[in-house]
Amino acid sequence: MRTVWLLLAAAAALSAEPAGGTSCESLSKLALPHTAITDAQVVAAGGFVAPAGRGPAPSFKDVPSFCRVKATLTPSADSDIKIEVWLPASGWNGKFQAVGNGGWAGIISYGPLGAAVRRGYAAASTDAGHVGGSASFALGHPEKLTDFAYRAVHETTVAAKAIIANFYGNGPRYSYWNGCSTGGRQGLKEAQRFPTDFDGIIAGAPANYQMHLHVWSVAVAHAMHKEPGSYIPPEKYPAIHKAAFEACDSLDGLKDGLIQDPTRCHFDPKVLECKDADSPACLTEPQVEAARKLYAPVKNSRTGVEIFPGMEPGSELGWAGLAGPNAAAVATDTFTYLVYKDPGWDWHTLNPDTDTARADKNDKGLIDAIDPNLKPFFSHEGKLIMYHGWSDPLIAPGNSVNYYGSVAKKMGGASKTADEIRLFMVPGMGHCGGGEGPNTFDMVSALEQWVEQDHAPEQIIASHSQNGTVDRTRPLCPYPQVARYKGSGSIDEAANFTCATPTAP
């Protein structure tokens, strides 16, 4: 049966009008539950131009011809979920990939759609039910908040699979999710709430504990501004970064400009305290205390229970994202529009103890995706790859370590879950990419091999480039393993490293 399916899929992939399927334009007449298809047209190879959006537009010059389907989903009377499904006109690999959002969503993820189609995938993305990058859509619209929380992704997945089946004459043999940040949260929510939607999920730097994450984010701003003189201007970040590396870089036995495991380093920024006049090379006493707060977890002052982990040594060059002149709007929006429902809410008034409790009570697991019970997903033979940059300055990487640990504990231990979930921590990488570490890697191929061939990823080769040229490769290892130098050969070549359990500090 599998051979017959593969032959049919191969035949369909060789034709711009799929065998057994339908033409692109006729998809506009397709009737699906609470779905209005608003457009279906063929886009020539390299001919797609993304609508104006947030940030620079990616290039689509090398994207092959595809059928672009646009639709609006209305699972509730107040829903207005926009989706796009991109279907390769030829060369379909028989698979489906849904791609995630960032921040508060509000826009189609065109770049990831193009990346998926380049690989032969039929792909889908949603704006999560609203337009724009703030959470103002949620004020007075609980159904739209539900769409953002989980419903838009699930409904997009259901509609996309139906559209794929109509176009090609066959549904996808494998379905994958690929997202980072909010997209990581969306992926974990799918695994927890709709365990049969996907065969494999990639969840990078997930914002899955959003209520606590945003308490922490505002607390970072508090640390910078609560006391006179606490604010650390960006011109001081390089000095802190350098001092952190001097304290941490060689702890893994190799001084290579990377901190393999920052949790083993107990860097104290007091070493930078100004001895004479203030300068970009030192920190004043209030700034030392502020920096200490950034590295430390936010805890409940009464119980001592951790609310959210702190930043790690190595993240300093990206501190401006949360530790700037004002609290990050993506975080304050949670309290302005969801918790207090008051556009006039002042972030300076945040109390981590009481506001965390209030946010948790308000959310009730709607947005947060912290349920460690993934048994239904694993029973479906689902595979989950998580990854997170150790130098992420926007979502503390300890959050991914904590969630991974909670799943392992719930499911009977890490040894029992290694066949279903693996976490890859990336030294020197920032939020979803960038940074001084090996920040380019192919998680999709690793997941495909795991799901389709039952070959679990023992390591994933990552690279770092300078001016377009690869200057270092390094294996990423399943947590808690780290890349260990074999003792000979270039430290810039992955072949000279092996994945090993870290030794005791």
Predicted feature locations:
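Cap/lid segment of the alpha/beta-hydrolase catalytic domain
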Residues: 93, 101-172, 215-216, 223-226, ...
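Alpha/beta-hydrolase fold nucleophile elbow
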Residues: 170-181
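Histidine-bearing beta->alpha loop at or near hydrolase active sites
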Residues: 420-434, 448, 466-467
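Short beta-strand/loop motif that positions the catalytic acidic residue
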Residues: 386-388
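Glycine-rich nucleophile elbow surrounding the catalytic serine of serine-hydrolase chemistry
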Residues: 179-189
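Catalytic-loop region of hydrolases
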Residues: 15-95, 111, 241, 254-255, ...
